[in-house]
A protein has these predicted regions:
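Low-complexity segments
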Residues: 28-195
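Classical secretory targeting signals
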Residues: 1-34
């Protein structure tokens, strides 16, 4: 008799635990909302002339090396660029200078450190601050849309001041520091126009 009560008791407890667990999972809300908190109150237009941008450091840091291991040559608009260790380089005066690839630059394989960013029903691939989209089985360098949010800036970003407000610039893209659901993030606010 005790064995029968234990068997039915354990079976009932297991049945209730599975039922309650399932009910608890179905009541959970699946909607995700993002709360974005901005510090700056001024808005920047989609394109900012280079003359309005003041860099905190007057000299841009140039990274140049004498040789790069396992480099791949990539041609774009008649110029050779070199790719190694998830960075792009150009060759000048016997040295390889680290650069950001130009708009329209196409590669067949994304760098290993890329992150997928979904914005306005489009997938962007961000690798070291450079945005790519997939077109015809290749990845093309593009400007991101204003409002795109990233959670970390690339290593070589620069602080800039526009109309008294501090922004962050990399590859002519301006970012503003924001809070997304309590986490620090950076929102694309503008693109710097080249002269």
């Amino acid at each position: 008799m005790k064995l029968l009560i234990k068997t039915y008791g354990i079976a009932t407890i297991l049945l209730l635990s599975f039922t309650l667990q399932t009910a608890a999972q179905t009541k959970r809300s699946t909607k995700r909302t993002k709360v974005v908190v901005r510090k700056n109150t001024k808005t920047v237009s989609k394109r900012v002339p280079r003359t309005k941008v003041t860099y905190k450091k007057q000299q841009r840091k140039v990274i140049a090396v004498r040789n790069i291991p396992n480099r791949k040559v990539v041609s774009h608009k008649g110029r050779n660029y070199y790719y190694s260790n998830n960075k792009f380089y150009t060759y000048s005066s016997g040295r390889y200078i680290a650069i950001s690839p130009k708009l329209g630059f196409r590669i067949s394989v994304l760098p290993r450190n890329y992150r997928t960013i979904r914005f306005n029903n489009r997938n962007y691939y961000n690798a070291s601050g450079v945005f790519y989209i997939k077109t015809n089985n290749v990845y093309e360098v593009v400007d991101p849309e204003v409002g795109t949010i990233v959670y970390e800036l690339p290593d070589n970003y620069e602080k800039v001041i526009i109309d008294g407000q501090v922004y962050y610039e990399f590859a002519n893209v301006l970012y503003e520091k924001v809070q997304v659901d309590g986490t620090r993030a950076y929102e694309v606010v503008s693109i710097i126009e080249m002269d």
